[in-house]
Amino acid sequence: GMVGALAVQNANKRWNVVTASLWVWAINVLVVAIFALSNCDSFEELAICALFYGGLNGLLPALIASGALPVLEGACKVTTHIRLLELANPNEPALHELLNRAPGTYMHSIMVANLAEAAAQAIGADSMLCRAGAYYHDLGKMRQPNMFVENQTGHENPHDKLPPALSAMIVISHIKLGQEMAKKYKLPPEIAKFIPEHHGTNLASFFYQKAKMQDDEPVFAEDFRYPGPRPQSKETAIVMMCDGIEAASRTLPVPNRENLKNLIDKIVSGIINNRQLDECPLSMRDINTVKASILRSLTSHYHNRVAYPDSKTMGKRSATSAPSVPQAAATSSEDVKAKTATEAKKKDS
């Protein structure tokens, strides 16, 4: 029993249960052989006894466990790594609906999951739980997808025509809607908790500041605050940081390493100053490790590419002794940055 428990404690595939059964079978054969030495008259009898009883005791429980595991998970309300892998399948009904109704939110969730999984691995947290939780953290946005900027490609922002208080109420409501959808799709509690905790009790600061600028009457911060609770685990705290950083990184005109590092420092400092991490077991060492991991991941994501010229351009360059490929690539990179900066200014204006 001890051998089997140790062998499957970190199982993330159903085949791991079969592998564990082989270890149990081998140990059982050895134990049965030792105890049967005094009762068996021949080696053949000893071998048959050890292989049969040892194998029966090792392989049969594995077959039973493989079939009973889904039933036991539901009855005991335990979420195993195997179940987390199933929840991370893009064909899961909730994720499939999210992709169809809010594709921008879906892609954001995928990116947050990548960042969170790497960060969790860096500090020894549950990386599979981080990935699965990140997939579902914005599930409530599919009810009104056009109210969230990542789904507004090529369309007007409806918040431009709404009072800030109403905009804040709509945006904040995706938490409650997400919790309702988590119940609808019968998501485990370990996954559902990512929905409220990834925003904690933060302020919807954009709409709060907008309301203060527009309204002559007093504006109360509590009307613009997420309901919480604050992150209660390392995993939900990691997703909170990754969520804010990933969204903000898309606004950088030049997402180079220095700008990304400054952005990460600013956002994480804001989360700490707002006391959002007070109720989770993350240490300052963990937080610094998470920041370093996110920086590595984002730097890789926003890497530069060489701009390969087409055949006509190549012909012209050959005739006029054009600059080498590295020089052309550098120029192309700067052009891309300048274009991005110009587009960002146009959007701001």
Predicted regions and their residues:
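Catalytic or ion-coupling anion/metal-binding cores of large enzyme and transporter domains
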Residues: 46, 204, 270-273, 282, ...
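Long, low-complexity, intrinsically disordered segments
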Residues: 325-349
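Non-transmembrane, amphipathic alpha-helical segments
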Residues: 47, 56, 60, 64, ...
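Cytosolic regulatory/linker segments at or just downstream of nucleotide-handling modules
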Residues: 274-299
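Conserved helix-loop functional segments at active or binding sites
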Residues: 5-9, 36, 40, 117-122, ...
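A glycine-rich phosphate-binding loop feature that marks nucleotide/adenosyl-phosphate handling sites
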Residues: 19-26, 48-54, 129-139, 195-202, ...
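Generic detector of multi-pass transmembrane helix bundles and their immediately adjacent loops
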Residues: 1-98, 103
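Divalent metal-dependent catalytic cores for phosphoryl transfer on phosphate-bearing substrates
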Residues: 95-257, 261-264, 270-274
